């Protein structure tokens, strides 16, 4: 049946929604704050510039792009009119393909992408065809029609308006939780609640996995002595950071839902897995100083894990666009690992106010200046670590662009050999 569907946000996700639903014969109305974005979308029957248009009449369904906050006025208006509000995730989970093939959902404050990619790699290594999709940058609706296990990264942005129970996932994991995205969610409770809504996507009697310290009803912890013993036997493994162990444990638990995972297959997958860039990515050294790109660390918790992984004699570059991070909480781990903090970008003064009395700290207007300062301070044996603990949007389009620029700066000063 043809429906009048309002697509809120016409970026990457909105475009994929329009492509998919146009093939289903629906009447599609796109809405965005950017006229340029609206014009760039094919398959729309009508286009509305939010802020200059009224909420349209006779809408059957609203599909919210992740960038549209769950309390956006048009979302709230739809809710008041009892119009269902969903995201591309809920649209995809209702397709026959998510009943035909096993599928897994992965959420958490940190480690989602690494776990998604590793689980996909693990299954393929075991001879089980699998494809990664979702918040990983591969819109879920663009992968309809491909056979194989679905491994879906799902963000709190995509879950925040999940109301209906859609029994599609063969298993799901909530990797961890830390203070984050308070520039998006109304408060920490709303952020946590959004993450928990992944349970609404589980098939009946399927497993909901959580991190070791978490205690939630109807859930199982991803850590097990069995996995620890397997990892300890992997003598030929490259060093595994503690947080990556959690990611591997989660993938192991989920993979067991579709068949027994042999220790040999698990260890082979770890040996052959290439972690995505910008996650404790070692860039090399010059004059005995090591350089590490951890641009993906956009939360205080991620910075803590990075510092614990690197260990000591760290010169850490923090800063960017604040997401409500608890910077005073870094004081303890900084005192154990760090020689100097360089606070850069939009929230550099916020970081300085929180930490300057506890550890040597220098302010920097941008990443280029921060690298120059770090090069001046660093001595043989030190590690310069970009682990911002903030979003990148004060000066960059994404953490990837920020990380790529950091790598360029390091190459230009011939730090890598």
Swiss-Prot record:
Swiss-Prot/TrEMBL keywords: ATP-binding, Cell cycle, Cell division, Cell shape, Cell wall biogenesis/degradation, Cytoplasm, Ligase, Nucleotide-binding, Peptidoglycan synthesis
Catalytic activity: UDP-N-acetyl-alpha-D-muramoyl-L-alanine + D-glutamate + ATP = UDP-N-acetyl-alpha-D-muramoyl-L-alanyl-D-glutamate + ADP + phosphate + H(+)
Subcellular location: Cytoplasm
Binding site for ATP: 108-114
Pathway(s) of this molecule: Cell wall biogenesis; peptidoglycan biosynthesis
Cellular component annotations (GO), alphabetically ordered: cytoplasm
Superkingdom of this protein's organism: Bacteria
InterPro entries given in the database record: Mur-like_cat_sf, Mur_ligase_C, Mur_ligase_C_dom_sf, Mur_ligase_cen, MurD
Molecular function via GO: ATP binding; UDP-N-acetylmuramoylalanine-D-glutamate ligase activity
Record-level GO BP terms: cell division; cell wall organization; peptidoglycan biosynthetic process; regulation of cell shape
Function according to Swiss-Prot or TrEMBL: Cell wall formation. Catalyzes the addition of glutamate to the nucleotide precursor UDP-N-acetylmuramoyl-L-alanine (UMA).
Family per record: Belongs to the MurCDEF family.
Protein name: UDP-N-acetylmuramoylalanine--D-glutamate ligase
Lineage: Bacteria, Pseudomonadati, Chlamydiota, Chlamydiia, Chlamydiales
């Amino acid at each position: 049946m043809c429906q009048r569907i309002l697509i809120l946000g016409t970026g990457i996700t909105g475009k994929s929604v329009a492509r998919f639903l146009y093939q289903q014969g629906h009447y599609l109305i796109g809405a965005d704050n950017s006229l340029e974005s609206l014009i760039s979308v094919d398959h729309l029957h009508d286009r509305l510039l939010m802020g200059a248009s009224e909420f349209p009449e006779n809408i059957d369904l609203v599909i919210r792009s992740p960038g549209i906050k769950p309390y956006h006025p048009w979302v709230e208006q739809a809710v008041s009119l009892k119009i269902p509000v969903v995201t591309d995730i809920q649209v995809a989970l209702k397709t026959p393909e998510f009943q035909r093939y096993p599928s897994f959902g992965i959420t958490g404050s940190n480690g989602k992408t690494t776990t998604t990619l590793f689980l996909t790699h693990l299954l393929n290594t075991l001879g089980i065809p699998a494809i990664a999709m979702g918040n990983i940058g591969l819109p879920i609706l663009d992968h309809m029609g491909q056979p194989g296990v679905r491994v879906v990264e799902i963000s709190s942005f995509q879950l925040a308006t999940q109301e209906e129970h859609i029994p599609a996932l063969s298993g799901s994991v909530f990797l961890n939780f830390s203070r984050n995205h308070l520039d998006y969610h109304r408060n920490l409770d709303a952020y946590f609640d959004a993450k928990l809504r992944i349970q609404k996507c589980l098939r009946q009697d399927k497993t909901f996995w959580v991190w070791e310290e978490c205690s939630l009803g109807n859930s199982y912890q991803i850590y097990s002595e069995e996995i620890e013993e397997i990892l300890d036997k992997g003598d030929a493994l490259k060093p595994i950071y503690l947080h990556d162990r959690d990611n591997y444990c989660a993938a192991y638990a989920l993979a067991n839902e579709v068949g027994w995972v042999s220790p040999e297959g698990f260890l082979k997958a770890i040996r052959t897995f290439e972690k995505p860039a910008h996650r404790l990515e070692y860039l090399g050294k010059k004059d005995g100083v090591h350089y590490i790109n951890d641009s993906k660390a956009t939360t205080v918790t991620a910075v803590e894990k990075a510092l614990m992984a690197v260990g000591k004699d760290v010169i850490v570059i923090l800063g960017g666009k604040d997401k409500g991070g608890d910077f005073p909480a870094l004081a303890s781990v900084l005192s154990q690992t760090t020689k100097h903090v360089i606070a850069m970008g939009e929230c550099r003064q916020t970081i300085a106010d929180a930490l300057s009395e506890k550890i040597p700290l220098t302010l920097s207007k941008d990443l280029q200046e921060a690298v120059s300062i770090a090069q001046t301070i660093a001595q043989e044996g030190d590690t310069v670590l970009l682990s911002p603990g903030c979003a990148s949007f004060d000066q960059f389009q994404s953490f990837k662009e920020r990380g790529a620029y950091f790598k360029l700066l390091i190459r230009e000063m011939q730090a890598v050999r």
